């Protein structure tokens, strides 16, 4: 229910009506009674209707004539207040649609009266509008009268009324046509749609039209009549009308209700018959008028164009063409031709402006333009309307730049401002605004001094006109400067945008349809097959038609567009404008490309290319015929010939870059403007977005880009992207900050351009690749014989293109890489470098790309990708090879796991590096190899392992870089470790391969040839490895030899157990002995010249400063390694059959090395000797885990951590298991003891030969005499114990003699003065040298063996004693080495070594050695004293005889410790030996020993050597105690057994004791020491012993007692004499002191007396002779006389002497007690 018919609304309406009628009644009460009555009856009428009817509104409408009557009467009063009240009430009724047709007629008549009386004009208009808009009851004459009323009010004198009336008319006209449209809608389903009117239809009768349509028809017909200044048929009563208003009304109807004219033939007829002729007639003044033409030539004055009419006509024309083009084809052709004419230069500027605005309206409607093309341009004899429009715009734009000739009246009042469209000849800086010292350009076009500003007139894509909308203007407006140019510019842009988007949209739809059809057609069913064929055929027909239209449109417009756009591009000073022009050119080029229009495509591309480059830039590719035809083409526009203006490039543009042109001959610099850069970006955009349609024009595009990139100084970076180069590279390149910020963007777009090549089809891609290759060839030609930097653009872009097309790389790989390989061989290094960069980058990318199927399943593709890498090996340029190797390295790092069949190729690249190709190449290749060995051995086929070994070995032999050689050896170790760990797998795979090869060989009838055949393939692999290491072991460089040697032996040691048993024969004879022979030969022939330190900063140690010394090291290492293998692998070698021969060869090598004059070699030979002697019984250690033998010197650090070197190997090769491989499951046990013994005796003979040869003193001595070193001799002697263990069963006296000679000779060898500080201990250290220790050890081993050995061995004891005693003698008499003169170390008491420069050789300090030997003698004698051989061979006598020497020397011994040790040893030996001697007294075997012993005592106790001056008192006392010990021994061990001892000997002993008791004084001592230095204790001991044995009642012979008595008598007599003399001299001297000697003597005598008395008292009384007592007592008076002496010392001694006499003061008890015997 609508808002006006709801119960509430109706109720309110009734209330309002009643109140209106009451108000009317009240107003008319006095003056107009009839009206009052009518109003009151009206109230009753309304109430009645409301009461009686349910449908109140319908009842009201039925009775509306009566209901409105009171109000009409009220209006008739002409009273303003009443009239207003009534009109408001009537409007209310109308708005509720309760007015019938009759009532409406009455109302209109009443309104007409009010109009004629000029009353309430605005209210009238409002009422009419309400009446006509709220219902459709008003028709025919009533409607026409209402419309006329409005027109009449439009022409009053009141402006407000006029304007309101104009608006009302417009609304009413619209309402009339809206009614018609609504009527048509209602009858649409009933009546068929009328056929569209044909152009030649006759006029139809109006009677066929329905009511609303008839009203509309009559109205439109009269509007045409009125505009044509004719009388109207229907709008009767019109008094006045303007043409402008009429045209506006016509335009609005045509614009708003086009369907009315298209659907009704009657209306269509009106269009053709009335509207079009009217428009053409009204255009007449505009067509004929020529600005500036002389009027006199024409017979009648030409009517001037009138702006308001002209502008409205153009609006109408725009609507006619836009809405009714299909109806008015011929008429539209006329209109369009007229429009084009209005653009002529001789037309007023305002006319040109509105005309160009009108054309702009069409340019934004591409479908309309398409219709023009189809209707005119494509018809054979028709005007080429579309082409003419485009050309006219171009001519119009060109004309604006042509300054009019002088004398031509520029303006006319009627025509408006002539300069409006544009040209202003301006000063040079016109359009520039100074800002802060800089200059900012206003947007403008500037060409040859003509400056035209660019105005912002509309949004792109919409034609919002300015002057076509000036409906209020009567006079022509003043057109702003540049307006017409701006609109024309927009026309071009919108035209291009519209056409291109339309065609591309349709193309897209067509392609989609084709695709859909194809997809559906791919599985047609039988029933629809025919149907599909039909639709496909229709599709093709449609496409042919569409394509013909598109091509015609482009062909019609491209020349004009290009001419205009090129001119504008050249003239543009505004970035935005330039951008728009370029965008238009780009879209046209792309469209032409899509349609396959090559000429036009290339023309647009050429234009962009030329815009990108500096003016007149010499680029041949752009100066083709295509471009030439363009520059001179003229277009005929309306009979005028307009030449294309060629670009002048004089426009003021900011220069942003200055650079060098890319040419063979250097030219001056060229300048790039910001516009050039903008064009470049467009070119990039074109190529990026439309690469698929460029085809052959890629050549144009890329050539231009290459030149721009060159001028801007962009250089390729990784991946082919271009980045700004360094300033250094182009000193003539100057870039402003403006362009610097652009460069990264340009670079980015360039990259994206080539990235987008991945979306090109294969053919387009080949076009691109071919274009790049030919560009590259040009660049290569330019770079020949030219030092100038080459252009790398093409190469960089080939790379980028390849990278993004990896998914289909196969189709372009060969041409791409083939060309890049050519580039790699170019003489220009920069060019080459980039060729290699591109090639390697492509290979790497190809291998990492995720192909489908993957490379692992597509070996052909993998090898195709890798092949160029191999081809690079044929190029000799080192920089290319370096790139190649770096590429290999990166391939390994990224793809190493999946190379598979590509391995031989990759390894071949590494191995192809020759020694002469420079250090960096070798280093890079080697890095690759390192990576292979560390990471990829498990992933490669086992057949490639030998190649790896060969390549690694070849790097070892390269002599450019030592570290590489050393590290390659480390790699060989790693490889061997890998073989070891993966042995089973490798062996299986190799055997399988071998079987296959064997089969092939048999089929071909050839012999399978491989190294070390017929060893198994896995063993051959090992042997190849050993052979490689063997080669390296004799390399000229010492470090390489050393490392290779260590590795070889470590490898054999660690992994040798994997070899088949038979293969060991090859290892020993072909690898090891062959190597030893070569090393020995090289060592013996090596140069002895000193090698200077290399490079000044590498110091060569003196031990390595000759080639000979360096080879010595190798010899050492090799020999040690071989010996180690013989030791550890003997269980494998011994069963081979010729082991004893191999043993002899090894011993021979050891002997020759040991006898080498090089200390290092000789010493090492002995160490090797030791090694082979420490062999344990085979197989005993099979349960122990084994670690590989490590050679003394670790593998060089350069190699880094070598896997496996320090890792213990799990004993998978436990000897038991391994031997199972060789024979039976039981390991062989060596049972042939005899053979073993022969091996050891061969070793003994070798040892003896080495020992005797090396220790034999030379006959003559000079500076170069070779004397073996101490370490050598030590090692030699140290070998004996180990060797002896094997030969002891057969070791006899002769062998002992041989041994003794060698020991004696070895110990006698002096040492070099250089080495002495390191070997000689100082005298304070009683340290033995290693050699001395070794000698004693050897003897110790022997004596221990003799001790436990059989009886026949024990006869060797004396020989051992002789050897030891000979060594003891060295303590006082060092041995002589031949005739060699040696310096001895200084006297022991100074406790230091003094080495004198002239002496070359220094004798050792033999004292500690001799002393240790003595200790050994004593110990051994303790064990063997009673042994028969020891007794028979007079060993004890020999010992005493040997000891006599140091004992007699005593203080003169080189070392004080010697004589002390000699004494203690003598005492120990005698304590053991004397009982044995007494035991054998009768045999006479010891007779000669006693005199020797007596002489020894004599020499020691009464030595001729004097104590040193610095001997301390305490030391003297200690020495005296030693003397006392000797006397005690005599007392305890000799004298008690005098019966068993020769008498001569006893007599000698007694004489000695006697002598000791008297002559014990020392000759040199101070007064202070006198009481100590007199050897009192010794004297006492001698006395006591003498007395003990003198008075012993055991004395058996008178002779013995006589000796004693005589000794006492002499002693006492001498004492008496000394005392008497002293007393006498004391008395005579008076106060003068006596001489010192005499005082000393008297003191000594007094002490001797006291000692004697003490001794006598202690002795048994029966042993003392009475006569002796008498002599003692007789001394007493003399002693008393001495009391008067003045010397305190004498007094003190006298006191001590007198005290003992107290015992004699007692009266004797009886004579018997004291009596004689």
Curated annotation (Swiss-Prot):
InterPro entries: ARM-type_fold, DCB_dom, Mon2/Sec7/BIG1-like_HDS, Mon2/Sec7/BIG1-like_HUS, Mon2_C. It comes from the Eukaryota. The modification N-acetylserine is found at residue 2. It is found in: Early endosome membrane. Its main location: membrane. GO terms for biological process: Golgi to endosome transport; protein transport. Residues 511-538 are annotated as: Disordered. Transmembrane segments: none annotated. The modification Phosphoserine is found at residues 205, 537. Keywords: Acetylation, Endosome, Membrane, Phosphoprotein, Protein transport, Transport. It holds the Pfam family Sec7-like_HDS. GO terms for cellular component: cytosol; early endosome membrane; extracellular exosome. Residues 522-538 have a biased composition (Polar residues). Belongs to the MON2 family. Homooligomer. Heterotrimer with ATP9A and DOP1B; this interaction is retromer-independent. Interacts with SNX3. Plays a role in regulating membrane trafficking of cargo proteins. Together with ATP9A and DOP1B, regulates SNX3 retromer-mediated endosomal sorting of WLS away from lysosomal degradation. This is Protein MON2 homolog.
């Amino acid at each position: 229910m609508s808002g006006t018919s709801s119960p509430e609304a109706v109720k309110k309406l009734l209330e309002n009506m009643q109140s209106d009628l009451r108000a009317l009644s009240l107003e008319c009460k006095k003056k107009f009674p009839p009206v009052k009555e009518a109003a009151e009856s009206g109230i009753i009428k309304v109430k009645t209707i409301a009461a009686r009817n349910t449908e109140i509104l319908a009842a009201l409408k039925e009775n509306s004539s009566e209901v409105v009557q009171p109000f009409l009467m009220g209006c008739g009063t002409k009273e303003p207040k009443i009239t207003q009240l009534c009109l408001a009430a009537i409007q209310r009724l109308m708005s509720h649609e309760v007015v019938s047709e009759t009532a409406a007629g009455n109302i209109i008549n009443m309104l007409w009266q009010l109009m004629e009386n000029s009353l309430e004009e605005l209210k009238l208009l409002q009422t009419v509008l309400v009446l006509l808009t709220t219902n459709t009851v008003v028709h025919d004459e009533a409607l026409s009268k209402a419309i006329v009323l409005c027109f009449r009010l439009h022409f009053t004198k009141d402006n407000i009324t006029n304007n309101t009336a104009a608006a009302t008319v417009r609304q009413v006209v619209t309402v009339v046509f809206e009614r018609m449209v609504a009527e048509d809608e209602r009858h649409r389903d009933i009546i068929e749609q009328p056929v569209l009117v044909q152009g030649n239809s006759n006029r139809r009768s109006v009677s066929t039209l329905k009511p609303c349509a008839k009203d509309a028809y009559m109205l439109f017909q009269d509007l045409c009549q009125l505009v044509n200044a004719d009388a109207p048929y229907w709008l009767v009563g019109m008094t006045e009308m303007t043409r402008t208003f009429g045209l506006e009304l016509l335009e609005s109807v045509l614009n708003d209700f086009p369907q009315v004219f298209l659907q009704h033939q009657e209306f269509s007829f009106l269009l053709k018959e009335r509207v079009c002729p009217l428009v053409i007639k009204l255009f007449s003044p505009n067509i004929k008028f020529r600005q500036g033409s002389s009027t006199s030539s024409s017979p009648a004055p030409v009517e001037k164009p009138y702006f308001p009419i002209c502008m409205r006509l153009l609006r109408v024309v725009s609507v006619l063409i836009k809405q009714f083009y299909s109806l008015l084809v011929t008429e539209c052709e006329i209109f369009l031709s007229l429009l084009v004419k209005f653009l002529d230069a001789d037309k007023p500027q305002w006319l040109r402006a509105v005309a160009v605005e009108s054309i702009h309206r069409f340019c934004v409607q591409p479908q309309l333009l398409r219709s023009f093309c189809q209707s005119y341009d494509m018809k054979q004899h028709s005007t080429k309307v579309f082409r003419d429009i485009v050309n006219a715009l171009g001519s119009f734009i060109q004309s604006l730049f042509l300054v009019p000739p002088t004398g031509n009246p520029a303006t006319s009042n009627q025509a408006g401002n002539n300069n409006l469209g544009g040209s202003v000849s301006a000063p040079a800086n016109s359009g520039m605004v100074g800002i802060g010292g800089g200059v900012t350009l206003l947007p403008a076009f500037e060409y040859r001094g003509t400056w035209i500003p660019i105005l912002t007139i509309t949004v792109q894509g919409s034609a919002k006109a300015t002057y076509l909308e000036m409906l209020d203007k009567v006079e022509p407006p003043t057109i702003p400067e540049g307006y017409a140019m701006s609109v024309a510019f927009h026309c071009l842009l919108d035209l291009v945008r519209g056409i291109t988007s339309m065609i591309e949209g349709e193309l897209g739809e067509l392609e989609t349809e084709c695709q859909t059809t194809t997809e559906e057609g791919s599985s047609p069913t039988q029933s629809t097959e025919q149907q599909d064929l039909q639709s496909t055929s229709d599709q093709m027909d449609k496409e042919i038609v569409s394509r013909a239209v598109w091509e015609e449109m482009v062909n019609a417009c491209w020349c004009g567009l290009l001419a205009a756009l090129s001119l504008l591009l050249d003239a543009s000073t505004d970035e935005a404008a330039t951008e728009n022009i370029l965008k238009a050119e780009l879209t046209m080029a792309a469209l032409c490309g899509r349609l396959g229009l090559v000429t036009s495509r290339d023309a647009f591309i050429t234009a962009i290319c030329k815009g990108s480059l500096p003016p007149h830039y010499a680029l041949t590719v752009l100066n083709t015929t295509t471009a030439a035809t363009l520059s001179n083409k003229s277009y005929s526009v309306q009979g005028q010939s307009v030449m294309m203006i060629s670009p002048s490039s004089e426009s003021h543009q900011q220069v942003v870059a200055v650079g060098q042109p890319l040419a063979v001959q250097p030219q001056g610099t060229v300048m790039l403007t910001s516009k050039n850069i903008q064009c470049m970006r467009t070119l990039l955009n074109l190529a990026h977005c439309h690469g698929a349609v460029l085809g052959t024009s890629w050549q144009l595009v890329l050539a231009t880009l290459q030149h721009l990139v060159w001028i801007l100084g962009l250089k390729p970076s990784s991946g082919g992207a271009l980045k700004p180069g360094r300033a250094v590279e182009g000193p003539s390149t100057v870039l402003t900050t403006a362009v610097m910020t652009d460069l990264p963007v340009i670079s980015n777009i360039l990259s994206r351009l080539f990235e987008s090549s991945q979306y090109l089809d294969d053919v387009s891609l080949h076009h691109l690749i071919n274009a790049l290759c030919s560009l590259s060839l040009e660049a290569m030609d330019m770079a020949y014989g030219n030092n100038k930097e080459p252009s790398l653009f093409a190469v960089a872009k080939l790379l980028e293109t390849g990278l993004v097309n990896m998914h289909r790389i196969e189709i372009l790989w060969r041409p791409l890489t083939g060309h890049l390989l050519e580039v790699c061989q170019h003489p220009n290094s920069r060019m080459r470098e980039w060729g290699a960069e591109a090639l390697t980058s492509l290979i790497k990318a190809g291998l990492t790309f995720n192909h489908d199927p993957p490379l692992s399943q597509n070996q052909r593709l993998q090898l195709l990708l890798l092949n160029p890498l191999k081809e690079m090996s044929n190029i000799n340029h080192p920089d290319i090879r370096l790139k190649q190797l770096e590429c290999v390295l990166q391939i390994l790092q990224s793809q190493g796991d999946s190379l598979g069949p590509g391995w031989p190729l990759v390894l071949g690249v590494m191995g192809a590096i020759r020694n002469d190709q420079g250090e960096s190449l070798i280093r890079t290749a080697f890095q690759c190899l390192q990576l292979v060995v560390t990471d990829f051995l498990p992933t490669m086929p086992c057949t490639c392992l030998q190649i790896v070994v060969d390549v690694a070995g070849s790097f070892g032999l390269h002599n450019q870089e030592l570290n590489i050689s050393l590290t390659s050896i480390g790699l060989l170790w790693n490889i061997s470790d890998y073989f070891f760990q993966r042995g089973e797998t490798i062996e299986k795979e190799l055997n399988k391969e071998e079987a296959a090869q064997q089969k092939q060989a048999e089929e071909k009838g050839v012999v399978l040839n491989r190294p070390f055949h017929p060893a198994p393939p896995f063993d051959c692999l090992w042997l190849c490895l050993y052979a490689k290491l063997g080669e390296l072991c004799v390399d000229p460089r010492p470090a390489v030899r050393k490392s290779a040697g260590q590795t070889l032996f470590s490898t054999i040691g660690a992994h040798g157990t994997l070899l088949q048993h038979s293969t060991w024969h090859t290892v020993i004879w072909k690898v090891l002995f062959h190597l030893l022979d070569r090393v020995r030969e090289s060592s013996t022939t090596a140069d002895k010249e000193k090698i200077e330190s290399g490079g000044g900063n590498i110091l060569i140690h003196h031990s390595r400063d000759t080639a000979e010394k360096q080879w010595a090291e190798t010899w050492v290492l090799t020999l040690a390694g071989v010996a180690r293998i013989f030791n550890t692998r003997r269980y494998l070698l011994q069963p081979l059959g010729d082991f004893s021969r191999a043993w002899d060869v090894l011993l021979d090598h050891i002997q020759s090395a040991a006898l080498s004059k090089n200390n290092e070699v000789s010493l090492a030979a002995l160490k090797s000797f030791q090694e082979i002697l420490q062999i344990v019984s085979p197989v005993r250690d099979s349960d122990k885990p084994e670690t590989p033998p490590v050679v003394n010197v670790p593998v060089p650090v350069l190699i880094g951590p070598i896997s496996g070197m320090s890792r213990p190997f799990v004993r998978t090769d436990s000897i038991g298991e391994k031997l199972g491989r060789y024979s039976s499951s039981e390991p062989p046990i060596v049972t042939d003891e005899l053979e073993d013994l022969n091996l050891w005796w061969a070793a003994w003979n070798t040892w003896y030969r080495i020992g005797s040869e090396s220790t034999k003193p030379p006959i003559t001595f000079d500076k170069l005499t070779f004397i073996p070193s101490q370490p050598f001799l030590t090692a030699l002697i140290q070998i004996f114990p180990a060797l002896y263990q094997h030969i002891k069963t057969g070791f006899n006296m002769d062998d002992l003699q041989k041994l003794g000679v060698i020991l004696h000779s070895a110990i006698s060898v002096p040492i070099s003065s250089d080495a002495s500080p390191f070997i000689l201990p100082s005298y304070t250290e009683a340290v033995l040298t290693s050699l001395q220790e070794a000698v004693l050890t050897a003897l110790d081993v022997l004596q221990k063996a003799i001790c436990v050995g059989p009886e026949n061995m024990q006869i060797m004891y004396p020989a051992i004693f002789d050897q030891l005693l000979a060594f003891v003698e060295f303590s006082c008499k060092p041995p002589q080495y031949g005739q060699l003169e040696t310096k001895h170390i200084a006297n022991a008491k100074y406790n230091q070594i003094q080495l004198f420069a002239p002496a070359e050789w220094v004798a050792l300090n033999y004292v500690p050695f001799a002393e240790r030997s003595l200790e050994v003698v004593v110990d051994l004698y303790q064990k063997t004293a009673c042994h028969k051989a020891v007794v028979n061979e007079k060993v004890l006598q020999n010992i005493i005889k040997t000891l006599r020497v140091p004992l007699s020397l005593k203080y003169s011994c080189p070392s004080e410790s010697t004589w002390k040790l000699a004494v203690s040893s003598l005492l120990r030996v005698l304590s053991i030996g004397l009982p044995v001697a007494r035991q054998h007294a009768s045999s006479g075997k010891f007779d000669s020993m006693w005199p020797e012993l007596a002489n020894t005592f004599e020499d020691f106790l009464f030595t001729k050597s004097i104590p040193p001056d610095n001997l301390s008192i305490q030391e003297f006392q200690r020495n005296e105690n030693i003397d006392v010990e000797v006397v005690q021994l005599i007392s305890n061990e000799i004298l008690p057994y005098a019966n068993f001892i020769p008498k001569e000997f006893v007599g000698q002993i007694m004489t000695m004791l006697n002598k000791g008791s008297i002559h014990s004084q020392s000759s040199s001592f101070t007064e202070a020491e006198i009481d100590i230095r007199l050897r009192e204790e010794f004297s006492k001991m001698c006395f006591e012993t003498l007395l003990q044995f003198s008075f012993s009642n055991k004395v058996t012979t008178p002779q013995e007692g006589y000796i004693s008595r005589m000794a006492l008598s002499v002693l006492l007599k001498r004492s008496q004499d000394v005392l008497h003399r002293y007393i006498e001299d004391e008395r005579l001297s008076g106060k003068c002191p006596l001489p010192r000697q005499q005082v000393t003597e008297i003191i000594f005598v007094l002490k001797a007396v006291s000692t004697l008395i003490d001794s006598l008292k202690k002795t048994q009384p029966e042993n003392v002779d009475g006569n002796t007592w008498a002599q003692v007592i007789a001394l007493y008076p003399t002693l008393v006389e001495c009391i008067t002496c003045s010397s305190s010392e004498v007094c003190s001694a006298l006191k001590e002497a007198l005290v003992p006499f107290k015992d004699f003061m007692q009266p004797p008890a009886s004579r018997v007690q004291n009596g004689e015997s």
